Amino acid sequence: MGVLGKRGGARSARNNDQHRQLLDATLALLAEGAAYAELTVQLIAERAGVSRPTFYAHFDDRRELLLELMDSALAPAVADLAGQGPTSGTALGPTRIRPTIALAMSIFRDHAPLFRALIEASTYDDTVRDWLGSLAAQFIDAAATTIRAQQAAGNALPLDPKAAATTLVWMTIDAAYRQVRNPPDLSDELVVDTLTTVAIRTVYGDQPNQHASAPAPPNRGRPRRR
């Protein structure tokens, strides 16, 4: 189910407890505020209570560990995209836009330290950057397919499906990251409502009769945390 496919199949017979300890140690260090660049193999191994050789028995490097954590965090979204979840099949259908965006925001929020590390690493690690691009591409392709279907049904505006999908997916990723990067000025729900309105108007224009099920953005937020 992972974006890059299954990695390290030969590792399945290795010590699962130590493997989990290394994953948990990394998550704990990130949750405590460590930047990804600060997470040396030695630091992770010490926190997990194992040796450096043990680390390398489970992972080729920090990058592989990070991406395994990402695969796990993203499992609900990937399952949804594959048609196994509550919003599957029509990611940009008029009644599915908000549930899809809300799912993305909740995953970012639930795994905030991990996503901060991912975005940080993507700025200087080509492999992580490519991984993030591959992740986005899955959702872009699904959204573009939905836009084409809605256009064929006479519901969507005559815009370029790939360009619209690319813009909306990266807009959502960027907005979700900004929400979890620092204490937010706005509530996650308000940002989800706003992204929903932007997406609906972009794809469908001002057609209120077709989008009666889409909630109107409420006027609520929360002050910046001090």
What do the predicted segments below correspond to?
Residues 1-39, 43-47, 64, 223:
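Basic, helix-initiating cap at the start of DNA-binding domains
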Residues 23, 98, 102, 137-148, ...:
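An amphipathic alpha-helix signature
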Residues 41, 70-78:
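Short, basic, alpha-helical segments at the C-terminal edge of helix-turn-helix-like DNA-binding modules
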Residues 49-59:
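Short hydrophobic/aromatic patch on the recognition helix
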Residues 59, 65-73, 139:
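Alpha-helical DNA-contacting segments of helix-turn-helix folds
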Residues 68, 82-110, 165-168, 192:
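Hydrophobic alpha-helical connector segments
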Residues 110-141:
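Short secondary-structure transition hinges
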Residues 129, 151-197, 206-217, 226:
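Hydrophobic/aromatic-rich alpha-helical bundle segments in the mid-to-C-terminal region
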